[in-house]
Amino acid sequence: MKKIIFWVAAIGLLAFFMFTQFSSFERKGLRRFEVLNNPSQEVIVGVCWPFSVNQDGMADGLQMALDEINSKNLAGGHTIRLIIRDDSFNSVKQKLIAREFADNPEMSAVIGYYDDGPAIQASSIFESSRLLHLLIGANNTDMTSHGFNYINRTVLSSDRIATKLAKLSTNHGYRKIAILWEEDAYGEDLAYQYQVGLDQLNAKVVYQWSYSRKNVDFRLLVNELKMIDADMIFFSGIEPIAGDFLRAARKVGLKTPVLGAFNNTPEMRIHAGSAYEGAIFFGFYNVHSQTPENQLFVKKFFDRYGRNPDTWAAQSYDALHILAKAIKFTGSRNPLDLSYAIRYADAFEGANGRYKFDRAGNLEDKPLFLYVIQHGVPVLIQ
């Protein structure tokens, strides 16, 4: 009887805590609307990204866009101010940053996140606190299926990635696939959607394996894979663990081609070592695209930074310009005004292609590109 009373009390306390927390974010949302409806020319935008870990072009793309928008009055008389936070792939930091942004009643929008897990948690917080969330990196399919009003995604969702990836895989002759995935919101979703895509193309999944980020040991896996008749291994997980897998696989002489869901980050290169050579991964941006918008972007970026832009430079640059266009169109700092303006606007032609959103805030379509590492450098597979 005491145990029953204990569990009833515990569940009651948990429900009370969740309700009060939700109510707190709701109150913050009401306060945000009050503040942002007051006249002001400044629009505050939060940014959350693992800058120190990824060391990519995200910050540079943002800064270039910010300078253009503010100097050329592209936000219709408003100026944008960025509050930039580095989450360092640290779960505690990620939660604190999301709460910090939700607590700021003067903030209109947030740009981020990279990883699906913290993005899912943050999106619920931002929805409750009425804060526009521009997702530029996280792909989880379900994030835009809850009827949220404040989320807009400028990158493909996992189901759309997987459909394209399955076609690319089979078009390159890979029809017997081993699928490995990380047990998280990104890895599981992408692996499942990829298998659905393969089933529709009559390709065969010959082996499956999952791993936890907290307890990774690939020794048994790579030896088992040597015994599997697979044309290709699909690794549905991110860096740096993907690099550890490549190193372990090549160490035992596993020569099967690997297609991964990772990015070309410093951590990935360090963890993979020489085993990185020949690895294949997909990307969302082609720096050599011949569209006028991309050619101009690449030239400006190279002139300013002395190097070509990467995916996240293009993604962040476009996201801030999309937001500026919504601010100019609405003349508002209100997150709901901006969210609807983005969803229902005509297609935006950016550095990274065409952006058109559906009613749920999901990006409708974009090309997907395959890259192979040759002499340590990603090379586009034609």
Tell me the role of every PLM-derived stretch.
Residues 2-382:
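Extracytosolic ligand-binding ectodomains
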